[in-house]
Design a protein with these regions (language model features):
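Bacterial Sec-dependent N-terminal signal peptides
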Residues: 1-29, 243, 247
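Short secondary-structure boundary/capping elements
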Residues: 13, 50-54
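Extracytoplasmic loops and strand-loop junctions of Gram-negative outer membrane beta-barrel proteins
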Residues: 39-41, 70-71, 116-120, 188-191
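Surface-exposed extracellular loop regions of Gram-negative outer-membrane beta-barrel proteins
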Residues: 58-64, 68
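Glycine/small-residue-rich hydrophobic helix-like segments
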Residues: 186-222
Length: 255
């Protein structure tokens, strides 16, 4: 039943996005996001990582309104581990102070799996399918401080992996801190609860980002620390460094 509801939510968002696109033909497309390389690919749920260097791409495609299509790809350099998802997102509330976003996505997770046949064992890349929904309220204090929460509910579509995932994250954000004439520092301490089927845990996580007013290149440090957990595969402390290229372009359709 939960999988069915998640699918219907994804479908309804997709239909609304298509309808919005048809009603917004005069508005330019906005393409934004970042491309990065990292020493350790960390998942959207930072409990888990690829434990090797990876390529990251997160982006958004919209026409400046409430709907957006947001791809998120995280893969090792050989393409054998990682994941890919396409978010369909809608801003229920989009005001100066308070924002409330909802979203849903289909996703694939790629992992190595040992297979034995005729006495021989080798590793294959297994693709697992998921459908997830999200709720993301946030409140902006000023140009530098904001607070928010994030809830993700994921449903696995196979029996040999996670079936039900609940991720609840409480977020603080401090941005635009000047470091000299051209550089800016942002940091975001967070605490979250994660439940995967019958296992659960509490964690500290966050990131520190260094940007420049004169360059699209940025450097991000991300960390994840256990508070209390019994989740299989969790590490007491995990981290990564990511070198990112940020972009934000507008394109107008020519008839």
């Amino acid at each position: 039943m939960k999988k069915c509801l998640s699918f219907l939510f994804v479908l309804s968002l997709f239909i609304n996005v298509i309808s919005y696109a048809q009603d917004s033909t005069s508005k330019p497309y906005v393409v934004a996001g970042n491309i990065g390389i990292t020493n350790n690919g960390i998942s959207i749920i930072p409990t888990f990582s690829l434990q090797e260097p990876a390529f990251n791409y997160t982006g958004t495609l919209s026409r400046g309104g409430k709907f957006s299509i947001d791809p998120d790809v995280r893969l090792t350099f050989d393409g054998r581990k990682g994941g890919a998802m396409i978010w369909l997102r809608y801003k229920l509330v989009d005001s100066k102070k308070f924002n409330f976003r909802v979203g849903a996505h289909p996703a694939f997770n790629f992992a190595l799996k040992s297979v034995t046949e005729n006495g021989k064992t080798w590793n294959i890349t297994q693709a697992r399918r998921f459908i997830a929904t999200e709720l993301a309220p946030s409140y902006t204090i000023n140009n530098h401080i904001s607070f928010g929460a994030y809830y993700l509910h994921g449903n696995g579509l196979q029996t040999d992996g996670p079936i039900s995932t609940h991720f609840v994250n409480f977020i603080s954000s401090f941005s635009g801190i000047k470091l000299g004439a051209t550089h800016l520092l942002s940091f975001s301490p967070q605490v979250y609860y994660l439940q995967i089927d019958k296992e659960d845990g509490f964690y500290l996580t966050g990131n520190v980002v260094l940007t420049s007013k004169k360059s699209p290149i940025a450097l991000m440090y991300l960390y994840n620390k256990e508070i209390r957990t019994n989740i299989t595969g969790s590490k007491n402390l995990d981290w990564n460094l990511t070198l990112m290229y940020n972009f934000n372009k507008s394109f107008k359709q020519i008839k």
